[in-house]
């Protein structure tokens, strides 16, 4: 399975640097000088290989210079490129409570009493923390967002394909978060 570890947001300066939106917990390893990156544009099958020539942080953003990208024009052509790895390249964690996003996607979600709720469709990362995006069983659209915290997500078994949640009252209500006047 292909996993995205970064995306080219835009070019930076005139010497061919690119700004990378990091989507990995290990940017210092994945984007180190000398690292070989595989990348492609969204919805394109052709995968290109790039070698990192220089890497630095600037104003909280990762800037890379890649071999064969000498100027702004070449860097602009990379805008939107997704840097990917194969999930088989990932080292399994020794921590039983640590998961890669792709391991959770597709798992069945049940309530503590065993009631089937739906399935994890995505793990969302926000400034406030991680959220499980859940598609309710029998529904084709819409999502339920559940904070991925120990107080609510009581157990995860990748081997059994199950996430068990014990949500606080009201979290699963369709109108949760709306005021009495519907706003």
UniProtKB/Swiss-Prot annotation:
Molecular function in Gene Ontology: ribosome binding
Q: Which UniProt keywords apply?
A: Chaperone, Cytoplasm, Ribosome biogenesis, rRNA processing
Q: Where in the cell is it found?
A: Cytoplasm
Gene symbol?
Answer: rimM
Q: What is known of its domains?
A: The PRC barrel domain binds ribosomal protein uS19.
HAMAP family assigned: Ribosome_mat_RimM
Q: Which family does it belong to?
A: Belongs to the RimM family.
The record's InterPro entries line, in alphabetical order, gives: PRC_barrel-like_sf, PRC_RimM, RimM, RimM_N, RimM_N_sf, Transl_B-barrel_sf
Q: What does this protein do?
A: An accessory protein needed during the final step in the assembly of 30S ribosomal subunit, possibly for assembly of the head region. Essential for efficient processing of 16S rRNA. May be needed both before and after RbfA during the maturation of 16S rRNA. It has affinity for free ribosomal 30S subunits but not for 70S ribosomes.
Checking Pfam families in the record gives: PRC_RimM (PF24986), RimM (PF01782)
Q: Where does the record place the PRC barrel domain?
A: 95-171
| Listed name of the protein | Ribosome maturation factor RimM
The protein's organism comes out as Rhodococcus opacus (strain B4)
Family matches, as Gene3D superfamilies? PRC-barrel domain (2.30.30.240), RimM (2.40.30.60)
Look up keyword Chaperone and say if it applies. yes
SUBUNIT field: Binds ribosomal protein uS19.
| Superkingdom in the source lineage | Bacteria
Q: What is its main location?
A: cytoplasm
Q: Which GO terms describe its biological process?
A: ribosomal small subunit biogenesis; rRNA processing
Q: Name one GO cellular component term.
A: ribosome
């Amino acid at each position: 399975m292909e996993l995205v570890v970064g995306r080219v947001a835009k070019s930076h300066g005139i010497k061919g640097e690119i700004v990378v939106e990091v989507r990995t917990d290990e940017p210092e390893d994945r984007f180190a000088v000398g690292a070989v990156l595989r990348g492609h544009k969204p919805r394109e099958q052709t995968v290109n290989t790039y070698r990192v020539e220089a890497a630095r942080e600037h104003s909280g953003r990762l800037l890379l210079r890649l071999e064969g990208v000498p100027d702004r024009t070449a860097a602009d052509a990379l805008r939107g490129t997704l840097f990917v790895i194969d999930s088989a390249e990932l080292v399994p964690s020794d921590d039983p409570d640590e998961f890669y996003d792709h391991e959770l996607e597709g798992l069945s979600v049940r309530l503590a009493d065993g009631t089937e709720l739906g399935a994890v469709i995505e793990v969302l990362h926000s400034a406030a923390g991680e959220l499980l995006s859940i598609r309710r069983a029998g529904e084709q659209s819409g999502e339920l967002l559940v904070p991925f915290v120990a107080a609510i997500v009581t157990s995860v078994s990748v081997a059994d394909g199950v996430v068990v949640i014990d949500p606080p009252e009201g979290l699963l209500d369709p109108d949760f978060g709306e005021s009495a006047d519907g706003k």
